Amino acid sequence: MRVVVAPDSFKGTASADSVASAVAEGWRRERPDDEIVSAPLADGGEGTVEGFAVARPDGIRHDVEVEGPEGPATSAWLELPDGTAVVELASAAGIELWGTNQPFTASTHGLGEVIASALDAGATRLLVGVGSSASTDGGAGMLAVLGARIIDADGDAIGPGNAGLADAVALDLSSMRPVPAGGVVVLCDVSNPLLGPFGAAAVFGPQKGAEPDDIPVMNGNLSRLAALGTVDPATPGAGAAGGTGWALLQWGAEIRSGAESIGAELGIPAIVATADVIITGEGRFDGQTAAGKAPAYVAALAPGRTMLVAGSIDADVSAFPAAVSLVDLVGRDRALNDTIDALIEAGAALARRASEPDLS
């Protein structure tokens, strides 16, 4: 049997590569003669650069010092041989860096610094993953690093974060760095607009520490920025990453499904085409998964042949012939604190399921 293990990362506990390795180890304990192929995935969030680096060993990693909440921090981008640069917001301006207690001041400045580094090195195309954002600044920090001027009534640059947008009276993009010749693709797993009840502040603000009373203020600040631009704030994906989707569209980027685009770049359709079984997964399988996350993408590529492993499962899994929740398998404490061993057990459980008459 040929088995492809193609999971996303388990956010905060295990990288996609680690998940794939652990599941494969468990599977081999039960079915040692099977051929196992590791194909870790990402959907534009945490682990996007790492996922490409594992799948594309011909890439060159470039570390970049970025502005963090408590001083300099280190992010990175990956240079591919064709001139493409893979960039992720998560390590440059994400929750992992900023935490969830600065909803009004967290900035996308670091993302701009990483993009600028890639452009300085001669990148001819950008793939920008925008998941795991900490900010709701409408991408203003990123735009400023790339040469945009967002000014207040005195003609000065506005302050950082969503709070700074309250003072914005003009947006000047005339001095922005040009989009590279091969274009900019935003890798995104959501289709939310910038504003309103389904927008960046209302839907994602609480994940970044915003209180209920903060949401109308944050939405109003984003609305002020949107009024200064030319991109329709209702554009699907404009609300991604606290409005960074809108800012990248303003620059000239296009938005695409993160998992699907990354899968195509990494050759996932061809890899799974000849597999007997595919195992995919993510930290939490819930109602958002069908909106473009890795498990839904893989299941659509190989219907009836895709098994699921997740930290927790809170949605219908009828599309998968077998599914394992780490919380159900080993308990919540072990699932969170001993994730790799739990994944090994999950891999073994799925292998046993594959040996049952209705699946073998």
Residue spans for each PLM region:
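N-terminal loops that bind phosphate or other acidic moieties
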Residues: 1-130, 134-360
